[in-house]
Design a protein with these regions (language model features):
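A cross-kingdom feature marking charged/low-complexity
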Residues: 1-3, 59-73
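A sequence-level detector of short linear motifs
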Residues: 28-29, 62
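A short amphipathic beta-strand at an alpha->beta junction
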Residues: 47-58
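Histidine-centered active-site/metal-ligand motif
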Residues: 8, 30, 54
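Short aromatic-glycine-(Arg/Gly/Cys) micro-motifs in beta-strand/loop hairpins
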Residues: 2-26
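A short, charged, amphipathic alpha-helix used as a generic interaction element across diverse proteins
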Residues: 31-47
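A short, polar/proline- and glycine-enriched secondary-structure boundary/capping micro-motif
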Residues: 29-32, 72-73
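Surface loops and adjacent helix of pleckstrin homology
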Residues: 23, 32, 56, 65
Length: 73
């Protein structure tokens, strides 16, 4: 059975960038949190998992469930 890993947006501690992570691995880097969230939302929708957005301090800012929205705009 395939494990479903949520998609996380978090600050990169080594650079002034935002990264999108899934399953403990970085899948993309972005200059703004907004662009990272847009990319993460697409990835979460495709994988039917939750999107968790963290602030620069590491705390969770928002949590979106995209499990049932794979085919929506």
């Amino acid at each position: 059975m395939r494990r479903h890993h949520d998609v996380h947006v978090c600050a990169d501690p080594h650079a002034y960038l935002w990264r999108v992570r899934r399953g403990g691995r970085t899948i993309s880097h972005h200059r703004t949190q907004r662009n990272a969230v847009l990319a993460a939302r697409r990835a979460a929708r495709r994988s039917r998992v939750d999107l968790v957005t963290h602030g620069r301090d590491g705390r969770i800012r928002s949590n979106e469930s995209l499990r049932d929205q794979a085919n929506q705009g």
